[in-house]
Amino acid sequence: LKEGDTRFVAMSWSEHAPPTSYEDAYSRLVWTAHHWQNWLARGSFPDHPWRSYLERSALTLKGLTYSPTGALIAAATTSLPETPHGERNWDYRFSWIRDSTFTLWGLYTLGFDWEANDFFYFSADVAKGTDDLQIMYGVAGEKKLEEEILHHLHGYEGASPVRIGNGAYDQNQHDVWGAVLDSFYLHTKSRDGMPEEIWPILKRQVHAAIEHWREADRGIWEVRGEPQHFTSSKVMCWVALDRGDRLGRLREDHELAAEWPLIADEIHAAI
């Protein structure tokens, strides 16, 4: 290229046609920048030196959302090693209920209620069936996320294996009930109400915590050996009872309001 020359490169995976000229590509670039600037303007950011970092974090969280369903994925990548040239290379392109709850809290705090509301209904959709709540789902609510090794790929800087899918999808992790109850409680407080069809879903999660809190599980570390007793899992079972109790009081469900605090106290004493 000589000074003053212009070129463009377009990588596209979209229903929309890619740009066919530099002018077209540049106009789309400008439009995209304006779109995200306008999106950030909807937020409520504190005025201090770290604001730009908060804005960048908000953009990252938004970039990890799947707009057709509201799912929030843990990462956009698979098989990047936890340590250089290591073997702990997992596929994180899925929506973990626990991790998404943290994202939900962050979005609410920064004023992005729309995105948080979308994830709320995604959680409701995956939890409303008769099956037990899983720890994670695909972006469209897929439940079966079987893990597969791609032997023909060498991996990032030679780190292998390269995996797609995640074998932890069917693990028992007892923090999941507290995570979903906490996210629904946060949503209910921000909305001053809860859709009527949601309450039976939440009661089922509380009852699951009551039934299983004494049992061993795989924990937030997703251990692939024998189940163990993790304090963090017991704490989140207590959270399920505590948030369930608070929601029950908001709904003036006096019977549950009398029962659940007693069980929460039992879990608290055990911890």
Q: What does each of the following model-derived ranges do?
A:
Residues L1-I271:
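Acidic, mature catalytic/reactive cores of soluble proteins
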